[in-house]
Structure formats: structure tokens, C-alpha cells
């Protein structure tokens, strides 16, 4: 499990994927999103495959919401040395910009990598560890550890052997909380 200040912490989290262009994501919207996270009784958020508005991180710091921060790499990329060097530069810059936020508790190097998982993951993971040796680093949020049994594949009993444990990066699927709401849709 996760330890925070020497005490076990059970994470109750969600995923933050922007529903609008980041250029249009205002300070007020960021503050509202953090307030909604708190209102939902959550204590953690994964900023999924992007770096978001500074006000979001400031709000998470203020409200005690932990941030799993993805580096904005999604799926596959050409095995190009210039691309790898630019990704390294940006990973270091992300830590420089966000590393002072006490809410940031984990860096993740890429989301759902395909053919390049064994190239970019270790490369960026090492760069993130070197830039911030105080936080854990996950080399990839790998689709093979995203349990959606009964939704995309598998069976609901597959939850008994949780892939990515103890900290899966994705879990479950979209659902309405009550059958009556599903009938309304």
C-alpha cells in the first residue's frame, strides 16, 4: 500500500482527462474540478496523458488531493533518436515545473505504450528518477494491467487477481450508479 508521512493511505481516486482544449481550460475551471474531486470524497487524481493548468495543481496542494502525473506520451511513437531526446527534455521540464507541488506523488512515463514500451519507458523512467529521486516512477501505464473484466474482455472474477497491483493505473469502466438511471438514458 501507499504510505504518506509513515501512515498507510487508501487511495480513492479518479482520472482527469480534459474535455476541452487545454488553452480554454481556465483557472476557474481547474478550481471547480478540484472542488468536485473533494466533494466526491476522493483523495487522488491521475492527470492522464497531459500536463494541466497550474491552478489545478495548486488546488490539489491546498485540498490535500494526491496527483499521479502522467508524462504526455500516449500509445506508440517512431523509434527516432531526435524524438527520444526531445521527450527526455520535456520529462525533465515537467519535473522542474511540477516537482515543487506536494500533491504530486508519482510520475508515469507513458500511457499504454505499444511497440516502444521497452525503449521509451526505461529511458524516460530513468530520467524521471534522476530528476526527482523522492517520488516513485512508473515506466508505463500499460493496457495489459488495466482491468475491465466483463467490459472489454475477461470475466468479473478476474478482479481477484488485480493486474498492476498494488497500484493499477486504470480500473473498471464507465457505469451509472443505479439501473433506473440506465433506463432513462
Feature names for model-found ranges:
Residues 1-39:
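N-terminal carbohydrate-binding accessory modules
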Amino acid at each position: 500500500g501507499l504510505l504518506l508521512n509513515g501512515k498507510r493511505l487508501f487511495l480513492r481516486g479518479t482520472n482527469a482527462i480534459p474535455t476541452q482544449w487545454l488553452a480554454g481550460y481556465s483557472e476557474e475551471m481547474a478550481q471547480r474540478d478540484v472542488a468536485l474531486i473533494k466533494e466526491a470524497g476522493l483523495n487522488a487524481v491521475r492527470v492522464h496523458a497531459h500536463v494541466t493548468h497550474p491552478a489545478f495543481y495548486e488546488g490539489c496542494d491546498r485540498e490535500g488531493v494526491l496527483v499521479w502525473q502522467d508524462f504526455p506520451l500516449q500509445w506508440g511513437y517512431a523509434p527516432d533518436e531526435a524524438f527520444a531526446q526531445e521527450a527526455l527534455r520535456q520529462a525533465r521540464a515537467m519535473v522542474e515545473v511540477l516537482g515543487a507541488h506536494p500533491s504530486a506523488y508519482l510520475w508515469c512515463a507513458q500511457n499504454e505504450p505499444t511497440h516502444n514500451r521497452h525503449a521509451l519507458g526505461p529511458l524516460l523512467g530513468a530520467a524521471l528518477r534522476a530528476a526527482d529521486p523522492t517520488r516513485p516512477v512508473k515506466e508505463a501505464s500499460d493496457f495489459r494491467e488495466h482491468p475491465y473484466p466483463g467490459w472489454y474482455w475477461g470475466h468479473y472474477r478476474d478482479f481477484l487477481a488485480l493486474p498492476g497491483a498494488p497500484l493499477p493505473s486504470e480500473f473498471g469502466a464507465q457505469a451509472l450508479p443505479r439501473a433506473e438511471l440506465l433506463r432513462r438514458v
